[in-house]
Amino acid sequence: MREKSLILVLIFIFFMGLSVNLLLPTKKTKNISWIASERLSDIDGRILEIKDVSGKRFTIMNFWATWCAPCVEEMPMLSKFYNETKMEGISVVGLSIDSEKNVKEFLQKIKVEHHLLVAGATGTNIMEKIGLNPSNSLPFTIMFDRNYDVQEIKLGKLTSNELLYWVNTAER
């Protein structure tokens, strides 16, 4: 009896997870032009606005934390993608909801070549304001165009194939 209950609970949790992803829009859902003037610090403590690190065509913005295993797994792929596409007007921006201290310690272990901004709790507020991640889960990635129209979103670990698909199928 106890085993049956556990199985039913696990099935329920599985389908709840699926339903959250099904409810998330995946194409140009809203304009987030307000984000352009959000001011955050980079890893060197310089205050930048999001528009300072946005791409001429697209910006891939990845919300992450050092304690999030899938986030850490994505980092090398995001840096590689950035290096391969930055000349095409595509920017990759990691927006950490961690402290600057934790991010600096993390960067001593893993080399990251794309833009990194340290947002702390402000990062969670930005995610909430974007409004496309009801659970505020990580990793959370959005792609927006030069007009700050959201083109794609992904809740969970992202693959390089998904990024390529996003860029190749997005409105130009």
Give residue ranges: language-model regions:
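N-terminal targeting signals for export/organelle localization
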Residues: 1-41, 172
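Short, small/polar residue-rich loop motifs at catalytic or cofactor-binding pockets
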Residues: 34, 57, 136-138
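A short beta-strand-turn-helix
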Residues: 37-59, 127
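Short active-site neighborhood of thiol/selenol oxidoreductases, capturing the structured segment around
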Residues: 51-69, 78
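C-type cytochrome heme c attachment motif
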Residues: 66-73, 140
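Structural microenvironment flanking redox-active thiols in thiol-disulfide oxidoreductases
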Residues: 73-111, 122-128
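Thiol/disulfide oxidoreductase modules built on the thioredoxin-like
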Residues: 109-112, 119-168
